A protein has these predicted regions:
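Short, hydrophobic alpha-helical packing/hinge segments within bilobed ligand-binding/sensory domains
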Residues: 17, 166-167
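Active-site entrance/lid segments in N-terminal catalytic domains of soluble metabolic enzymes
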Residues: 1-156
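Single conserved hydrophobic/aromatic residue that forms the stacking wall/gate
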Residues: 168-178
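Glycine-rich adenosine-cofactor-binding loop
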Residues: 157-163, 170
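Conserved acidic functional residues
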Residues: 104, 159, 175-177
Length: 178
């Protein structure tokens, strides 16, 4: 999927994610509320709205226990992005369930930590993007190049990609997060 929808907090629910998936992109449901029942309803609504693949984002900072992890496993989700925390906390449970896990990283240090944790890929988010930021404010294109020197994992470029020209210049990435 060349365009992967960002899991924007409080916005990226089943309506948006299904529209993206139906249009040929890859929709992702956000779970910032941490409310397992609400997230279950959003995941199940996706099956009414699309027959296309989609993923779920799990912000680690907001996970109080493994209930959300168990939910994505029970609902047979195949792709998860994690963010805002150490992916090592839940990576093995997710991967043991056959789920592909990409972790959002705003820095080289975060990327190296995620690689060591065993993620399947990275969502590389420069300072131009939303979400949790690196205080060093490294731009996307510099960040992509610096991370690519250290790993061959698939990378999704995220942040500030608004047209085809910028899409083209994100050539160090494998896909784009918009």
């Amino acid at each position: 999927y060349p365009i992967i929808q960002a899991p924007m907090g409080w916005i990226a629910r089943s309506q948006l994610a299904s529209a993206v998936s139906n249009a040929g992109g890859f929709g992702i449901i956000e779970t910032s509320s941490g409310e397992t029942e609400n997230c279950k309803n959003e995941i199940r609504a996706m099956s009414d709205l699309t027959d296309k693949p989609f993923g779920v984002n799990l912000p680690i900072l907001f996970l109080q226990d493994e209930s959300m992890i168990n939910l994505v496993i029970d609902e047979n989700i195949k792709f998860v992005t994690t963010s805002a925390g150490d992916p090592a906390k839940f990576i093995h449970v997710l991967k043991d369930a056959g789920i592909k896990v990409f972790h959002a990283v705003p820095s080289l240090a975060g990327a190296l930590k995620a690689v060591r944790a065993g993620v399947d890929g990275l969502v590389v988010e420069g300072t131009e993007g939303g979400g949790f930021k690196n205080p060093e404010e490294v731009g996307l294109y510099v960040l992509l190049q610096s991370i690519r020197k250290h790993t061959d994992l698939p990378m999704i470029a995220a942040g500030g990609i608004v047209d085809g020209c910028l899409l083209y210049t994100s050539d160090a990435a494998d896909d784009v997060h918009r």
